[in-house]
């Protein structure tokens, strides 16, 4: 072979590889272009949606041979991820089906697979959007109405299942009901009797289902002026109204109507039989909710009318706005812009709809989807983008909330306080306070003055005391927070008569001279083991005076800032641990922090959090301290419950962390064992990567992890038992006293306390649920007062 020919062969090989790379690159470019075209179809452009669709159909039809799988995947993804463009994509699929029946069948199969997979994986929203898409394909003559009705009937069959949670049955009924606005008209025209039969089955189920959970999820206890409807009841009323209107709605864009002459000639596909996966105890279903209403048409100025509470348009608008928030909540500026670009904004009072939906999210029970600050930041961006109208609507909403605050759920009260204080801090703390001065005549425990007091406390965290004083009218003096300074009793006028003053002064000098923890311990030894708080020392386990002197002196010296306090606690961590070995001693530490910092709520919160992190105090000690007699005057203040919830969350996170670590370790152990046995069997034929000792946890290590998790679960259960037992005790005492004195027990204090009990159940429902049977056996027994017992029963009903 000549050198010339060899050189030519090498060139040919190089050219072949280069051409292959070019083909791959070109294919990728075409795929990216197709994806971009499909994703952007129907969005704003100079041409209409219909002409966009016609052009896209021509492009896709030409590329079906090469990029069929890619197109199938993109379209099915769009169906789930972009439900607001459902009818645009169903029209696109309908036009492709009219031109290529085989592709239409493949897409239906792909969509059915997506639907079944979503149900199996408990992706409930994705399943609902898939069902809606399949239903809308009936309008595009892709799927037969008969086969869709069979699927809907099969889903309603779930409502007759026995021994399954009601939340499972509820979801399947909700999925069917929420699909009917898209396909109801077509089913009414083609299969009216079958549709009526389906609706009758739904009505039978709705009439017999339990709604014990309803009151726990209400934002307001009163139904005036707007009823707080349970979500399925509300949607059912909207569907009945739609049926009365012959299934004619005015909100859903239906581009397929333009192509009716083309689509009606296409052959249709039948859906295969789809059986919902049976219930599994590991399945977590969506919890029920209450439909939030703040405005009606009388609240809106001249312009487009707000659809009625039972019009299907209200449901469709709200669902669309909720989905925009879900899609863009990570970026507040984009979210605000998308909300204000709502496609039907000229047909509705958009600002009112947006504000109502955002507050619906913020006040969603048992917990909002996102952090409170997420909604606050979106509202601020909306005010910036729409300064002429949105601030006025928001002010109107705030006024409505304040006027209805008397019957507001306690959890929602807290969220309202947090939002309003944050909002004020972004707008120079400007508000027309004079309009609310009638609340000054009310009792301090009444929700209105309490709201203003709590708002000012939160504003203090975001500003400084003088600023708060300057922004408020002088008439509000009694609601303005105290100046947040430490009350160091060993420097007061009465200090000379207090035991421990001399040691406290000695300690001040030593700490300022940067003494060691050991030196502090030696100084504290000068305090005798008796003669102070004899009741607490009866068991001889701790010295209350030592704790008093040490805690108050150290934290007073660190009072300049949070950082100074943290540094002081960290440096003398060993002294804290030595003094606070028992729960009683830890409660004594907490009480002394309160005595020093009673005028600074935020300092109290961060210091308790720090003590928990450093394991100086246990979660159970914090819970017991909160319910102690010394804290009676603080019992209805928000910061105390902030401390309780951060304590419970810390315990919950610890349990979840240990649970995750154990699961990972067990998984590694089982994989290592199976890998080892497989490699033994395959040794002659196959070499495997060896399992190192570091990768595989020992069985002893796993056992230790199990023991740690078991101990953590015991501590968590004990914490919940302490909290709920204390609630029952103080509420039962209140009921008994009221009965003895012949007074109405329904006082402001009672409503706050029962609200806090409900808040603990709902805020930590996932963890509390594990112990519901224990709680029922030990605490929430049938002989308990019905008002207290009802809170527990409502909680249990959420997952029933």
From Swiss-Prot:
Q: What Pfam families does the annotation carry?
A: MIF4G, MIF4G_like, MIF4G_like_2
Q: Which GO terms describe its molecular function?
A: mRNA binding; RNA cap binding
UniProt record, GO biological process: 7-methylguanosine mRNA capping; mRNA export from nucleus; negative regulation of viral genome replication; nuclear-transcribed mRNA catabolic process, nonsense-mediated decay; primary miRNA processing; regulatory ncRNA-mediated post-transcriptional gene silencing; RNA splicing; siRNA processing
* Keyword list, A-Z: mRNA capping, mRNA processing, mRNA splicing, Nucleus, Phosphoprotein, RNA-mediated gene silencing
List cellular component terms (GO): nuclear cap binding complex; nucleus; postsynaptic cytosol; presynaptic cytosol
Q: Which residues carry this modification: Phosphothreonine?
A: 9
Q: SMART domains, per this entry? A: MIF4G (SM00543)
Q: In what residue span(s) does the MIF4G domain sit?
A: 31-243
The record's Gene3D superfamilies line, in alphabetical order, gives:
1.25.40.180
Which intervals of the chain are annotated as region Disordered? 1-26, 669-704
Q: Which InterPro entries match?
A: ARM-type_fold (IPR016024), CBP80 (IPR027159), MIF4G-like_typ-1 (IPR015172), MIF4G-like_typ-2 (IPR015174), MIF4G-like_typ-3 (IPR003890)
Compartments reported by the entry: Nucleus
Q: Where is the composition biased (Basic and acidic residues)?
A: 692-704
What is the annotated role of this protein in its UniProt record? Component of the cap-binding complex (CBC), which binds cotranscriptionally to the 5'-cap of pre-mRNAs and is involved in various processes such as pre-mRNA splicing and RNA-mediated gene silencing (RNAi). The CBC complex is involved in miRNA-mediated RNA interference via its interaction with Ars2 and is required for primary microRNAs (miRNAs) processing. Also involved in innate immunity via the short interfering RNAs (siRNAs) processing machinery by restricting the viral RNA production.
Q: How does it assemble?
A: Component of the nuclear cap-binding complex (CBC), a heterodimer composed of Cbp80 and Cbp20 that interacts with m7GpppG-capped RNA.
Which family is it part of? Belongs to the NCBP1 family.
Entry protein name:
Nuclear cap-binding protein subunit 1
Q: Which organism is it from?
A: Drosophila persimilis
């Amino acid at each position: 072979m000549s050198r010339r020919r060899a050189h030519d062969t090498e060139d040919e090989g190089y050219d072949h590889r280069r051409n292959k790379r070019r083909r791959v690159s070109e294919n990728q470019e075409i795929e990216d272009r197709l994806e971009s075209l499909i994703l952007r179809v129907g969005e704003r452009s100079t041409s209409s949606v219909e002409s966009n669709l016609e052009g896209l159909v021509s492009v896709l039809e030409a590329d079906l041979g090469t990029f069929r799988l890619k197109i199938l995947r993109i379209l099915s993804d769009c169906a789930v991820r972009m439900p607001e463009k459902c009818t645009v994509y169903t029209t696109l699929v309908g036009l492709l089906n009219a031109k290529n029946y085989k592709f239409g069948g493949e897409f239906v199969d792909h969509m059915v697979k997506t639907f079944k997979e979503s149900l199996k994986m408990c992706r409930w929203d994705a399943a609902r959007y898939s069902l809606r898409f399949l239903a809308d394909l009936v309008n595009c003559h892709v799927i037969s109405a008969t086969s869709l009705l069979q699927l809907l009937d099969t889903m309603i069959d779930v409502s007759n299942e026995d021994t399954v949670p009601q939340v499972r049955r509820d979801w399947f009924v909700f999925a069917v009901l929420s699909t009917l606005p898209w396909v109801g008209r077509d089913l009414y025209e083609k299969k009216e009797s079958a549709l009526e039969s389906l609706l009758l089955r739904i009505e039978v189920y709705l009439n017999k289902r339990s709604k014990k959970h309803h009151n726990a999820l209400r934002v307001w206890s009163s139904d005036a002026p707007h009823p707080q409807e349970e979500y399925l009841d509300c949607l059912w009323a909207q569907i009945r109204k739609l049926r009365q209107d012959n299934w004619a709605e005015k909100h859903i864009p239906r581009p397929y109507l333009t192509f009716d002459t083309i689509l009606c000639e296409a052959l249709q596909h039948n859906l295969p039989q789809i059986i919902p996966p049976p219930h599994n105890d590991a399945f977590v279903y969506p919890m029920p909710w209450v439909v939030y209403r703040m405005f009606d048409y009388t609240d809106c100025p001249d312009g487009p009318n707000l659809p009625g509470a039972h019009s299907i348009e209200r449901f469709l608008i709200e669902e669309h706005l909720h989905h925009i928030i879900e899609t863009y909540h990570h970026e507040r500026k984009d979210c605000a812009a998308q909300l204000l670009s709502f496609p039907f904004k000229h047909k509705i009072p958009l600002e009112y709809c947006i504000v109502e939906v955002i507050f619906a999210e913020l006040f969603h029970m048992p917990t909002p989807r996102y952090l409170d600050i997420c909604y606050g930041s979106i509202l601020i961006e909306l005010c910036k983008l729409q300064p002429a109208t949105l601030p006025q609507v928001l002010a109107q909403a705030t006024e409505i909330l304040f006027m209805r605050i008397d019957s507001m759920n306690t959890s929602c009260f807290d969220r309202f306080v947090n939002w309003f204080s944050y909002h004020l801090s972004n707008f120079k703390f400007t508000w027309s306070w004079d309009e609310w001065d009638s609340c000054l005549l009310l009792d301090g425990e009444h929700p209105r003055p309490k709201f203003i007091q709590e708002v000012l406390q939160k504003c203090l965290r975001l500003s400084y005391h003088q600023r708060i004083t300057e922004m408020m009218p002088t008439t509000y003096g009694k609601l303005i927070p105290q100046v947040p300074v430490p009350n160091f009793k060993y420097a007061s006028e009465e200090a000379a008569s207090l035991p421990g003053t001399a040691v406290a002064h000695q300690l001040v000098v030593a700490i300022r001279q940067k003494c060691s923890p050991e030196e502090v311990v030696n100084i504290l030894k000068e305090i005798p083991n008796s003669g102070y708080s004899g009741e607490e020392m009866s068991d001889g386990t701790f010295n209350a005076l030592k704790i008093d002197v040490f805690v108050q002196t150290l934290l007073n010296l660190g009072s300049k800032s949070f950082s100074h306090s943290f540094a002081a606690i960290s440096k003398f961590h060993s002294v804290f641990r030595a003094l606070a070995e028992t729960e009683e001693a830890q409660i004594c530490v907490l009480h002394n922090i309160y005595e020093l910092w009673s005028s600074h709520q935020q300092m109290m919160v961060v210091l308790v959090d720090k003590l928990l992190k450093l394991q100086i105090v246990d979660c159970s000690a914090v819970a017991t301290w909160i319910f102690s007699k010394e804290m009676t005057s603080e019992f209805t203040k928000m910061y105390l419950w902030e401390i309780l919830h951060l304590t419970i969350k810390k315990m919950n996170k610890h349990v979840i962390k240990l649970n995750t670590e154990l699961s990972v370790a067990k998984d590694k152990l089982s994989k290592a064992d199976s890998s080892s046995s497989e490699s033994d069997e395959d040794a002659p034929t196959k070499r495997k990567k060896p399992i190192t000792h570091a990768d595989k946890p020992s069985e002893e290590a796993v056992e230790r992890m199990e023991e740690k998790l078991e101990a953590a679960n015991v501590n968590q259960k004990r914490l919940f038992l302490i909290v709920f037992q204390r609630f029952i005790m103080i509420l039962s005492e209140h009921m008994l006293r009221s009965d003895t004195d012949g007074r109405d027990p329904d006082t402001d204090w009672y409503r706050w306390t029962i609200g806090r009990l409900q808040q603990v159940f709902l805020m930590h429902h996932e963890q509390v649920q594990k112990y519901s049977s224990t709680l029922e056996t030990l605490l929430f027994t049938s002989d308990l007062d019905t008002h207290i017992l009802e809170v527990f029963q409502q909680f249990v009903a959420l997952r029933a």
